[in-house]
């Protein structure tokens, strides 16, 4: 049994906008100790300069001074293969934010197999969307339909296939830029895949979850809506998310979800 007074030894994978926000939130939490940060080699010096000697900043799992009790990934899809898989194999429980990558079934299998091999637990964070607990509970009784509708301001879709569908810089009315499965949405819009993939994995799966993505000049924030029905009844939840102050492209709720995961790990009473 864990000593109630010993802080949980944590490794953070990634130190971008989300990682930095999470670190600031828990830096002085007596129940947690972020003792390790894993970032790409070219970022190590900058992160060491920001965090000082109290944190072990390395570029690989092999370089860690010791095995952490818990790891939090907020680094992007590549980090799942490079860092989360070996940590799980070594027996470290991990929570991951890059859920969109799990539309690749081979990667999901690799993570699951690594967790089995190490006797570790892999937690998928809810990230920028709410209602995941209700959706996952409803699945136990059977779900007939799950739909996700995602709206962004037109310029939020720059750099995606939406640019070939409409003039994102001169839109006067909303336009649907994608309709299909969550798996196809994740493949075509990888930078916007985390919410759709999270909903799919909590509910009826990547192929049965229907996704509609909309460029909407009437909205100023990213708007997420889940519609589901099944043996439990019906649900409809809509969220209009604010970004992190330090990064307008990153959902604040994604960072809060990661903070919650860390604090839940250190708590003996979890909701």
UniProtKB/Swiss-Prot annotation:
Gene3D superfamilies, sorted: Dihydrodipicolinate Reductase, domain 2, NAD(P)-binding Rossmann-like Domain
UniProt record, GO biological process: NAD biosynthetic process
The keyword Plastid appears for this protein: no
Residues the record lists as binding NAD(+): 128, 194
Known role: Specifically catalyzes the NAD or NADP-dependent dehydrogenation of L-aspartate to iminoaspartate.
Family assignment from sequence similarity: Belongs to the L-aspartate dehydrogenase family.
Misc. remarks from the entry: The iminoaspartate product is unstable in aqueous solution and can decompose to oxaloacetate and ammonia.
Protein name: L-aspartate dehydrogenase
Organism for this UniProt entry: Burkholderia pseudomallei (strain 1710b)
């Amino acid at each position: 049994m864990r000593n109630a007074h010993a802080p949980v030894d944590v490794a953070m994978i990634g130190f971008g906008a989300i990682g930095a926000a999470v670190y600031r939130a828990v830096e002085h939490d007596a129940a947690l100790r972020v003792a390790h940060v894993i970032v790409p080699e070219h970022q190590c010096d900058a992160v060491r300069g920001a965090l000082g000697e109290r944190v072990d900043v390395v570029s690989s799992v092999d370089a860690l001074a010791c095995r952490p009790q818990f790891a939090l990934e907020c680094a992007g899809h590549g980090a799942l293969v490079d860092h989360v898989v070996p940590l799980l194999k070594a027996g470290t429980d991990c929570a991951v934010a890059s859920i969109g990558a799990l539309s690749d079934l081979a990667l999901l299998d690799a993570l699951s197999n690594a967790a089995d091999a190490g006797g570790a637990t892999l937690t998928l964070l809810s990230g920028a969307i709410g209602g995941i607990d209700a959706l996952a509970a409803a699945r136990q009784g059977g779900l007939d339909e799950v739909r996700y509708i995602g709206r962004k301001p037109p310029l939020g879709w720059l750099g995606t296939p939406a640019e070939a569908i409409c003039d994102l810089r001169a839109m006067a009315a909303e336009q649907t830029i994608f309709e299909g499965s969550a798996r196809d949405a994740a493949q075509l819009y990888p930078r916007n895949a985390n919410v759709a993939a999270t909903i799919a994995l909590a509910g009826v799966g990547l192929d049965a979850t229907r996704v509609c993505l909309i460029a909407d000049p009437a909205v100023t924030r990213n708007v997420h809506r889940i519609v589901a029905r099944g043996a439990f009844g019906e649900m409809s939840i809509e969220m209009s998310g604010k970004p992190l102050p330090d990064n307008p492209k990153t959902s604040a709720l994604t960072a809060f979800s990661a903070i919650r995961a860390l604090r839940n790990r250190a708590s003996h009473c979890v909701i």
